[in-house]
Amino acid sequence: MLARFGLFFIILSLGFHQGIAQDRYAVFFTYKPQTNFSLSNPEKFLSQKSILRRNRDKIPFDSLDFPVASKYTLGMRPHIQEILYTSKWMNAAVVVTDSEKSKTLQALPYVKKVELVAKGFYSRSGNRLDSLPPSSKWANRVMDNQSNAYDFQNQLIGIPDMHKAGFTGKGVLVAIFDAGFPGIKESPAFAHLFANKQIQGELDVVRPWNKDVFTKNQHGTNVASLILANQPGVLVSGAYNAQVILALTEDEATEYKIEEFNWIRAAEFADSLGVDIINSSLGYLDFDDPGMNYSTSQLDGKSTYVSQGAAIAGKKGILVVNSVGNGGAAGNSSLVAPADAPGILSVGSVTSSSTLSSFSSKGPTADGRIKPELVAFGQGPTLIRSNGAVGAAAGTSFSAPQLAALAAGLWEAKPSWTKEELWKSLVKSGSQFAQPDNALGYGIPNFRAAYFGELLGISGTEPSSWTIYPNPMTSEQVSILFGKELEVVVRLIDPAGRVYFDQKVNRISSSAPFEITLKDLPSGIFIIQLFDKKQVGTLKLIKP
């Protein structure tokens, strides 16, 4: 979440108490000695599924897989009130202590540095103990508009084709990091998760002693519905048969750097269970304590803790799908961490006419890489609320999970693919792969193009050579110039997902246009999807 751009969702305030000087610190260790674990026996510290994922991607085990040395955590105890958790990837512990004792921690011979990551702490009674006033820093982008049928958001990225081919994410493990998942137990859209025992893990990192993640903010429920919902006629999402890990990483009341460590802790937990995909509709740049803020020059994929964690997850064979942010009004380089991390998919938002949503953050990263990589419909997709009702919302929070679902179905279809192969296939399927930019990235991905791309050698062509005319339409006849093949599949859909045309069309030569007749087409803006043996394209058509 990000205060600066009013990202993602409304946060409810919690009660505070005054006068408590205990804060939360990250304690980084210099070394990582091990006596109980060996790289030759990874089954001692990783699940079988995690080991299989490493083997599939030919990823060696390394010291990052080892836990923090227990003798270090034991040695700290006289100087702290509590250890909240440790991070093996950061070789650190997040602890509760006061400022004076933090200085004694810094003096320990095995401590590299101590950093304040949050003011105050949570007691096990559930109360927030902090000397700062409550905060409600995030602006809401949730709309009460319920007119958007889910068909459109699915059609845009090829979910119907994926389902028709029999792929619904089965056997793929997806982790969702968010601020809570209320209503999931009661909602019919999620009933199958419990009937089929698809929930493989639950973790509250904010309050590690809490065992109930089906509470707090409904943002996580909204996000989860765009991956997992299966309620025909209401919402059927792309990967409803996927297995899932639900992790509560966001502190509703405040915005401190500890949430980066919460994210990393959840990623380590998910990794240990063998997760395939992480969906994170979260982002960080500015904090309640200005001294913790990052500058845009630090969005280089390696300067923020959370981007380091996301990059490590990617190197472990996990596909991280992250919202690029809702700071589009700020212009270029308005993304947030960890969307800047290398090797992940950062996701922006488009409107129902496939143009960039005004709120969608833009790249590039500080080191010049294209961001976002891909986009999906984020300006009003249909989703499920915590009360089980259908709704619609806007934000890159809601475009990212749609692509996480697409990735899960594609990985089910191609189980031998490495994470890198999956990433490349999704990117190459983008509607503007040949001419990427820092607004739409490589464009809108598509299941059919990603699935067949490996076999058919999909590559981009100059989008400027793709033309539909007359546009706006002046008659029922429309001509399309696209690619060099003699046959193309043409699909025409409206913003509600209704399909008006879906046929194979032929032409006599590669220089001739494809000709189609669109009878009884109502007035409006339509999206034409084009598929041949080499590429996929997306064009807009206007009917006055």
Task: Specify the residue positions occupied by each region the protein language model found.
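Subtilisin-like serine protease catalytic core
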Residues: 22, 39, 160-259, 273-276, ...
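Primarily auto-inhibitory N-terminal propeptides
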Residues: 22-82, 101-103, 112-124
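Autoinhibitory propeptides
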Residues: 71-154, 162-163, 342
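C-terminal subdomain of the subtilisin-like protease fold in secreted/lumenal serine endopeptidases
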Residues: 151, 275-279, 412-471
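Substrate-binding/access-modulating region of protease and related hydrolase catalytic domains
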Residues: 163, 230-233, 247-340, 366-369, ...
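Catalytic-core environment of secreted peptidases
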Residues: 188-200, 352-397
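Hydrolase catalytic cores
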Residues: 227, 247-251, 334, 378-440
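C-terminal outer-membrane/trafficking sorting elements
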Residues: 462-469, 473-544
